[in-house]
Swiss-Prot record:
This is Large ribosomal subunit protein uL24. GO terms for molecular function: rRNA binding; structural constituent of ribosome. Part of the 50S ribosomal subunit. GO terms for biological process: translation. One of its GO terms (cellular component) is ribonucleoprotein complex. HAMAP family: Ribosomal_uL24_B (MF_01326_B).
C-alpha cells in the first residue's frame, strides 16, 4: 500500500490483461489498451475503478423499493495495471513529482506538481 500518483478524474490506459475474464460464449476477453477516466481510487487495496473497464455483471435479488435483475458495473483493477495517459502525446506515461517553492505572506510553501515522464509537461 503505497502513495498513489493516480487521482480521481485522471485519464488512464490499461497496460496488462486482467486474468480470468471471459465473454458470454466462454472465450477469453481483455481490456488491454482501453482508456478511461478514474472514477474512484481505493488506496487501502491499491486499486482503481476505471470508467468502461473491467465490467462485471451482478445478479441482484429484489428487495422492497429496489428492483432485482442483472446489474452491470465496473470492478476495481490493480493500480499497477494502469498508466496515466500523457495529455500531450495521448500515450501511457509514468508520473514524476516536481517540487516548487512558493513564497506567500512571508512564508515558504512547497507545492508538489505531477509531471508526465514522457513529455515533461505538468499534469
Amino acid at each position: 500500500m503505497g502513495k498513489t500518483r493516480i487521482k480521481k478524474g485522471d485519464l488512464v490506459q490499461v497496460i496488462t490483461r486482467v486474468r480470468g475474464r471471459r465473454n458470454a460464449d466462454g472465450t477469453k476477453t481483455s481490456d488491454l489498451g482501453k482508456q478511461g477516466k478514474v472514477l474512484e481510487v481505493i488506496a487501502e487495496t491499491d486499486r482503481v475503478l476505471v470508467e468502461g473497464v473491467n465490467r462485471i455483471k451482478r445478479h441482484t435479488k429484489a428487495r422492497p423499493g429496489v428492483e432485482g435483475g442483472i446489474v452491470e458495473r465496473e470492478a476495481p483493477i490493480h493500480i499497477s495495471n494502469v498508466q496515466l495517459v500523457d495529455p500531450e502525446t495521448k500515450k501511457p506515461t509514468r508520473v514524476g513529482i516536481r517540487t516548487e517553492q512558493v513564497e506567500r505572506d512571508g512564508r515558504t510553501k512547497t507545492n508538489r506538481i505531477r509531471v508526465a515522464k514522457r513529455s515533461g509537461k505538468d499534469i
